[in-house]
Amino acid sequence: ILITRTPYKASPYGKKMNSRLWGSWQNYAREKYIFVIQDVRGRWKSEGEFVNVRPFIANKKKKKDIDEASDVYDTTEWLLQHTKKNNGKVGIIGSSYSGFYSIMGALSAHPAIKAAVPQAPVTDWFLGDDYHHNGAFMLCDGFRFAASMNRPRPVPTEESTPAKPYYQTDEYSFFLKAG
């Protein structure tokens, strides 16, 4: 089983997913890998509350202590029990934000996870990553990203909530005018 977890939408869902299999994924398909592309907690068709780069909890003490690692653990358990013809081995792969989820998969310490492949993962948004560059907040990038990721979503859905348009080529003037 090869898992990719994403905040960006796992659709097309079900058997239509084959349209996503391009490039190196076709090699895995020829080798009979079972693909799972999962919307993360609180995004698109997944229930719960989405938290941007939800922190890892090393010593979970209560059932309410959830993080992306515990979600990967639970997903892996469910897949092993409900997916026919699996060999009991799981890999988790992703790049950028999905790479962060691959790291969390490794931290889940599920014994069936044999490989984690984080490619250019989001790691520390406060130092040297997309939101902050050496501690300086990247307002334009953060604003654009938050406008797409942090919109309210009261129920699981395939529909996108429209963002408030702010069409602007001169972002300095846009923020200056906004106050």
What do these predicted ranges mean?
Residues S46, S96-Y97, A120:
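Catalytic nucleophile serine of serine hydrolases
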Residues T83-Y97:
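Alpha/beta-hydrolase fold nucleophile elbow
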Residues Y97-H110:
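Short glycine-enriched nucleophile-adjacent loop
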Residues L21-W22, R30, P55, K62-D65, ...:
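Accessory cap/linker subdomain of secreted extracellular hydrolases
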Residues I1, E31-F35, N86-V90, P111-A115:
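Loop/turn elements at helix/coil->beta-strand transitions in domains of secreted/extracellular proteins
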Residues I1-Q81, Y131, F137:
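Cap/lid segment of the alpha/beta-hydrolase catalytic domain
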